[in-house]
């Protein structure tokens, strides 16, 4: 096989024992869609503060403001894993449903609509207040003007795992909000990585991310009869043309961790 430089980072925290397993945990990656978890955190945070209710509706629109220069931009529908919102321009959808679509189908459109509502800076401030290291959200999806200026999101496996750990321990916003977030993450439709080789009875609340040669999966794994563990796998350097290779490698790592912790 051709030698490409592949970087893999893994961070595990076992909530049963407190044990950690870390490989390159502080390596910075383009987070791709894993950062949508942090948008969800701030949505629940602002709902808790009474700034809006999750049942409130927002207009579905495909026009967004660049954080770099205030210019307008739109998302490429063909690049979005979630297609059902695009034919509905001008209609409204609830914040709750937009949040669900952002997570379970990785809707870029829902992400940017929600980010315009809550504000990227507020998401970053909340990440900071939770003490989550190595995670930076500065812009929404496909903000080309910001990208050209080097204004990019970033994350580490340690940061993603700490995020999942806080959600699993129901310490984010409130116990009820954390439970709702877990429920959303359990509905994840992209299951090629962390859950792929685990026993069917094992629930996984997780969020995948993919862009270019970057493939990630971060989540909470619930083995039978014990407390869960938080796991993040981040990769760079797998072929864009062969996503199956990245997914297979991540699935193997997930299975290895699962077996090791049993």
Place the predicted regions along the sequence by residue:
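Beta-lactamase-like hydrolase cores
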Residues: 1-27
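Sec/Tat-exported extracytoplasmic proteins
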Residues: 1-4, 41-51, 62-64, 68, ...
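Mid-domain, small-residue-enriched loop/turn segments at the edges of structured enzyme/sensor domains
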Residues: 7, 91-95, 99, 105-164, ...
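Acidic helix-start/capping segments at beta-turn-to-alpha-helix junctions
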Residues: 15, 54-78, 117-119
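Active-site SXXK
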Residues: 18, 30-63, 102, 231
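Solvent-exposed, acidic/flexible segments
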Residues: 28-37, 51, 88-96, 103-108, ...
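Conserved catalytic neighborhood of penicillin-recognizing serine enzymes
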Residues: 65-112
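Structured C-terminal helix/loop/strand segments within mature extracytoplasmic catalytic/sensor domains
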Residues: 117-119, 162-192, 202, 208-262
């Amino acid at each position: 096989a051709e030698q490409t430089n592949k970087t893999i980072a893994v961070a595990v925290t076992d909530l049963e024992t407190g044990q950690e397993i870390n490989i390159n945990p502080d390596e910075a990656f383009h987070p791709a869609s894993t950062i949508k978890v942090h948008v969800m955190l701030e949505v629940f945070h602002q709902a808790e503060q009474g700034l809006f209710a999750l049942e409130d509706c927002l207009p579905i629109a495909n026009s967004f403001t660049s954080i770099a220069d205030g210019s307008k931009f739109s998302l490429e529908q063909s690049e979005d894993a979630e297609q059902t919102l695009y034919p509905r321009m001008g209609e409204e959808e609830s914040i709750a449903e937009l949040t669900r679509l952002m997570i379970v189908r990785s809707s870029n459109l829902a992400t940017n609509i929600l980010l315009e509502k809550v504000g990227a800076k507020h998401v970053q401030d909340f990440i900071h207040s939770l003490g989550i290291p190595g995670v930076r959200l500065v812009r929404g999806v496909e903000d080309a003007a910001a990208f050209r200026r080097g204004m990019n999101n970033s994350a580490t496996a340690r940061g993603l795992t700490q995020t999942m750990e806080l959600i699993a321990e129901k310490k984010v916003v409130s116990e009820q909000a954390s439970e709702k977030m877990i429920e959303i993450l359990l509905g994840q439709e992209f299951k090629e990585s962390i859950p792929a080789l685990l026993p069917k009875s094992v629930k996984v609340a997780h969020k995948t991310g993919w862009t270019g040669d970057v493939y990630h999966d971060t989540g909470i794994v619930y083995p039978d009869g014990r407390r869960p563990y938080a796991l993040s796998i981040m990769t760079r350097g797998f072929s864009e043309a062969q996503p199956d290779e990245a997914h297979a490698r991540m699935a193997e790592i997930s299975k290895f961790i699962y077996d090791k912790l049993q």
